[in-house]
């Protein structure tokens, strides 16, 4: 459960860190959005160091959680209801993430 929570917090940090500069560029937001965006990306990189396995495996497993959090962001922040295809994609990526993240350690 701790691993999953860490993945979710890491994904939120990455999404916020990318969303704020996007909002500045795409929607003419304040240039001050870049500061919390940069801090959020720094937090994202720092959080990755807490994942206790090889970096490649962390990134692969984290990708599934990122997809799920991004679709949740779509719904909660962008106010776009996810389609059945979105939800099927999330289910598939979380299944893949679970296989990678929770494999037996030999």
Swiss-Prot record:
Pfam families: UPF0060
Residues passing through the membrane, by range: 4-24, 30-50, 58-78, 82-102
UniProt subcellular location: Cell inner membrane
Topology within the bilayer: Multi-pass membrane protein
GO cellular component, as recorded: plasma membrane
Predominant cellular place of this UniProt entry's protein: membrane
Keyword Transmembrane belongs to the record: yes
Coiled coil, from the record: none
Origin superkingdom: Bacteria
Record keywords: Cell inner membrane, Cell membrane, Membrane, Transmembrane, Transmembrane helix
UniProt key word Cell membrane: yes
NCBIfam families in the cross-refs: PRK02237.1 (NF002586)
Family recorded in the similarity comment: Belongs to the UPF0060 family.
Protein name, UniProt field: UPF0060 membrane protein Bphy_5052
């Amino acid at each position: 459960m701790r691993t999953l929570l860490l993945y979710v917090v890491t994904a939120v940090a990455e999404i916020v860190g990318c969303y704020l500069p996007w909002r500045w560029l795409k929607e003419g937001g304040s240039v001050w959005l870049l500061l919390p965006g940069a801090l959020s990306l720094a937090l994202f990189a720092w959080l990755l160091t807490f994942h206790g396995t090889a970096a490649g495996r962390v990134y692969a497993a984290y990708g599934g959680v990122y997809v799920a959090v991004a679709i949740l962001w779509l719904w909660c922040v962008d106010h776009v209801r996810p389609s059945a295809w979105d939800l099927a994609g999330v289910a598939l990526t979380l299944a893949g993430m679970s296989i990678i993240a929770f494999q037996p350690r030999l």
